[in-house]
Amino acid sequence: MSSVYKTKNLQGHERPIKQLKFSKDGKYIFSASADRKVIKWNYKNNSKDSVYMHNASVNVICLSNSNKYMLSGDGAGLIYVWDINTNENIKKITFDKLYNITSLNVSSDDTYFIMTCSERGKQNSFIAIYLLEDIIKIEKEEIKTETENKLQVPSEMKKNIKTEKAPNVFKQINCTKENTKFIKSCFTNMNKSILISREDGILEMYDFTNDTLISSEKFHTSEILDFDVNYENGIIITSSKDGEMSLINLNTFKLMNKFKPINPVRLLNSCQIAVIDNPYYVVPGMKSEISIDTLFDLNTMDITKLRYFENESDKEKAQKFKNKKQIVLACVGGGQDSKFVTTTQQKEGGFEIIIYNVFTGEKLAEFLDHFGPVNTLAVYKDIICSGGEDSSVKVHDIKHYLFS
């Protein structure tokens, strides 16, 4: 692995980063922070496109698959609805009780909006599912396009922003187990099922259509902080407070592998699956024309452009990956609990981002780019974005880490 890597630093937050999301087309990154802001970044030129203001720490965000709406949940238990194409705050949603909102997601067909939360100061937690159209609908005359409603203006200064009670719940799933809470949920299997992580290290699959629990397995000894699903390869990865990452078969719900990146135990706050094209792939049937020294340039698909390797390290990488057209990666980040960060050396805090080959378990890259825990990761193709307790947002080229 090379000690030189490619990183972009996006500067604009003053407090810890809570969550990152790519737009569905990969053009923008959205970063939610404890400084009450969500920033929409055009990361290719390191510029801010818009700033979305709350009155409290913004802890969770999600984007509709139509690339039109963003929903953001804050520490005051409010959800704001934004039109990310016009940069307008459509409305904010309040609830009858004060909730800790721990995850927001939208179904792949944009039919449903799913929220994981617990009542403030109480143990009970639940998952509330709404029709997305009920969440975003608003009377046309209440949508303003004036300059005063652009998102660079703090929300408390805006006029005519509709505040309303949450619509009727379409379906609710309650956590019936004692001494545990739901942490995160999302739709899976063509929106027929819901994947749920819990505080006690259990991952559950719930049948959304028939309202029955399909599977419930304990994959960790402590809270599952994050998970990600890859449907093409039929896998789930989970990261936990116990310092381990699990690889799970989506279809059988059985454990395939365990990864323990850091010893002693550090919190693994976030995990993501990345599937990248392999620049060392040897096209079948072309071995007579192409040897390990002259590989086909997969990026340009031009037979006249051959890749020549200058050293033995490149040859070893080519040999390792040449039979795989795509490489499936597990990316994980975390670190020591933030309350201990000020007394810990950077290298001792476990603040590295680690990339594994999902199926072999081999560590392919490890890099340190934050001065504190990595709180959140987001992946789009071969780009990985990380947000830290140090308030920084970093954009990394995965191929540069793996192949340069």
Model-derived segments and their meaning:
Residues 1-14, 45, 165-170, 360-361:
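A short helix->beta-strand "capping" segment at the edge of beta-propeller domains
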Residues 10-17, 52-58, 94-101, 174-182, ...:
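WD40/WD-repeat beta-propeller blade N-cap
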Residues 20, 61, 104, 185, ...:
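Hydrophobic core register within WD40 beta-propeller blades
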Residues 24-25, 65-66, 108-109, 189-190, ...:
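Residue-level detector of Asp-centered blade-edge/turn motifs that repeat once per structural unit
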Residues 29, 70, 113, 194, ...:
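Hydrophobic beta-strand positions that form the internal "hydrophobic ladder"
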Residues 32-35, 73-76, 116-123, 197-200, ...:
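Conserved strand-to-loop turn within each blade of WD40 beta-propeller repeats
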Residues 39, 80, 128, 204, ...:
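WD40 beta-propeller blade core
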Residues 43-46, 84-87, 132-135, 208-211, ...:
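Short loop/turn segments that connect beta-strands within beta-propeller blades
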